[in-house]
A protein has these predicted regions:
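Signature for phosphate-centric chemistry
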Residues: 27-170, 174-424, 428-527
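Bacterial signal peptide processing site
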Residues: 20-22
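A conserved catalytic-loop motif detector
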Residues: 13
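C-terminal motif of bacterial Sec signal peptides marking the signal peptidase cleavage site
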Residues: 16-18
Length: 527
């Protein structure tokens, strides 16, 4: 997390909007009954955004014939031993100097619980290949199982038909551990609920939670060009000759990576965000309840820079001693750093309730401070992954063009009566979901800002917790009637969602969430 933020605060729940008709607004990602934000940002645990029983009825004469999904992996633990160990080293020094408040005394045990939970994350859990940092939590596993359950309930007739058709369910992922695991837990739930589906899922490697069941590009279970397009590279992705479409995606990926690493306008904007006069004040609101003032003032001076050096050991459920070492690359050199690191633990804790066993990091993070750090992270994501600034010429969303085209290509196969599958299920990452949502231009969600403006909760409705919470997903259900008319209906985080407003003419009727597919394809100028 970069430190820290040019911000202007607004109320907790400014929600993304899509018009329901020309005069009426409809929120595509805000829940029907909203609860106050915890400001976990993109680490927000997943919740379906609409009641399954409140979806708009299917137009008379139409039957579901196909569905497709793109989903982010579920809730996870910390990616590596960074913030937790650095804070623990800081805490131990404060303890040695008797510089802790009564609440600060409690922080030590909670940091130990956080490290233990991450070191053992996934231990003994079927479907987790190697326990430890970076794995999905039990919350994350249940998120994808829940989405699978509701998909079966939403489209019972479609999956009944799928159970009679060979290779009717195609599953793909980025090939990265968390995405692969999410795919396997999703398909495991499909199989648990409807065992007859097991022989109809392809590739077969997705039908087993066993670690010996390995995915590959060769069996079609991994597609980096569609599901890891933000990070394509020569060593991994140019081993085989590329198709024209793959070459275009690869070129877009290189342009995006150059933008992220080299673009002067982006660097200047992120620097502007980092120079926030409120950062020190907010940091003190976090640290003053935990540490004595004289200790906080020493942070950054000689002997008071704390890194993720050293190690921490835990005892596994089988009695083994397991030790995790820090890499020493993450340092706390100021009060601002310390508070921001604590926010990272707070934000990840929401998706680790089972593993943390009642440990509550809420008490260490005032709501206003959480909002401050969430706004800063949202600003960084907005510029680096999301709509960005107008002058960036859509470089952050051009990388999703191949995936967007594939969504339409799968429906084209239905129209042409060439579709071999009843469902195509794809599992990826926030870096995929965010550009895809931007590329589809979901109404009033994805506007870039001119460089002269700076992202804040005042200037934009874009929110990471709404666009890409854990297990964020976009789904298209496809319907046909006997006359061969094809309709598409979109769900974003399981809420009926409209396409961009310029496509309103493609809606099947006024106020309908169903779109005439051929008109929609024309609207998006898909060839």
């Amino acid at each position: 997390m970069k430190i820290l933020l040019k911000s202007s605060m607004l109320c907790a729940s400014i929600l993304l909007a899509a018009c329901n008709n020309d005069d009426q607004q409809h929120n595509p990602t805000s829940p029907e009954t909203s609860t106050p934000s915890k400001y976990y940002q993109t680490k927000t645990p997943y919740q379906p955004q609409q009641d399954l029983n409140k979806y708009q009825a299917t137009p008379p004469g139409f039957q579901p014939v196909f569905t497709e999904l793109v989903a982010r992996h579920g809730s996870r633990g910390l990616s590596s031993m960074k913030y937790d160990l650095a804070l623990y080293n800081l805490w131990k020094q404060a303890k040695a100097e008797q510089a802790l408040t009564p609440l600060g005394e409690k922080l030590g045990a909670d940091l130990e619980s956080m490290m233990k939970a991450n070191i053992l994350l996934g231990y003994g859990v079927e479907g987790i290949r190697q326990f430890g940092y970076g794995n999905e939590s039990m919350t994350g596993i249940q998120e994808h199982r829940g989405i699978a359950d509701r998909l079966l309930k939403r489209l019972p007739d479609l999956f009944k038909a799928a159970s009679t058709q060979p290779a009717s369910i195609l599953v793909q992922s980025s090939g990265v551990d968390r995405a692969v695991d999410s795919a396997k837990f999703f398909t495991a739930e499909l199989i648990q609920q409807q065992p007859q589906l097991k022989t109809h899922i392809t590739p077969i490697s997705y039908t087993s939670l066993a670690s010996s069941s390995v995915l590959s590009i060769e069996d079609g279970g991994v597609d980096r060009f569609k599901l890891y397009f933000h990070s394509l590279n020569k060593d991994q992705d140019l081993a085989q000759p590329l198709s024209a479409q793959q070459q275009a995606i690869y070129d877009a990926s290189q342009a995006y990576q150059h933008f992220e690493e080299e673009d002067t306008d982006l660097a200047n904007k992120l620097d502007e965000l980092a120079k926030n006069s409120r950062a020190e004040q907010v940091a003190k609101s976090v640290l003053n309840p935990l540490f004595k003032a004289e200790f906080i003032q020493k942070l950054g001076t000689t002997g008071y820079v704390f890194s993720n050096t050293g190690s921490y050991s835990v005892i596994s459920p089988k009695g083994e001693t397991i030790t995790e070492k820090g890499k020493g690359k993450n340092s706390i050199a100021s009060a601002v750093d310390a508070a921001a690191y604590l926010y990272e633990l707070y934000s990840i804790s929401g998706g680790m309730k089972t593993e943390l066993k009642g440990v509550d990091f809420d008490r260490y993070m005032p709501v206003d401070a959480a909002k401050f750090y969430a706004e800063y992270n949202d600003a960084n994501d907005f510029y680096s992954k999301g709509p960005s600034f107008t002058e960036s010429n859509s470089v952050t969303s051009a990388i999703a063009q191949g995936l967007k085209q594939d969504l339409f290509k799968q429906v084209d196969a239905i129209v042409d009566q060439q579709q071999a599958h009843r469902a195509v299920l794809r599992f990826a990452h926030a870096e995929i979901i965010i550009p895809l949502a931007t590329s589809l231009e979901l109404h009033n969600m994805m506007q870039p800002l001119p460089l002269r403006q700076t992202y804040s909760y005042n200037s934009s409705t874009w929110r990471g917790e709404l666009v890409s919470p854990m297990a964020a997903n976009l789904q298209w259900d496809i319907y046909q009637n006997k006359q061969g008319i094809t309709l598409v209906k979109m769900f974003y985080n399981e809420k009926e969602t409209l396409f961009k407003s310029s496509c309103n003419y493609a809606r099947y009727s006024n106020n309908s969430f169903y779109y005439d597919y051929l008109k929609l394809k024309q609207c998006y100028q898909i060839q």
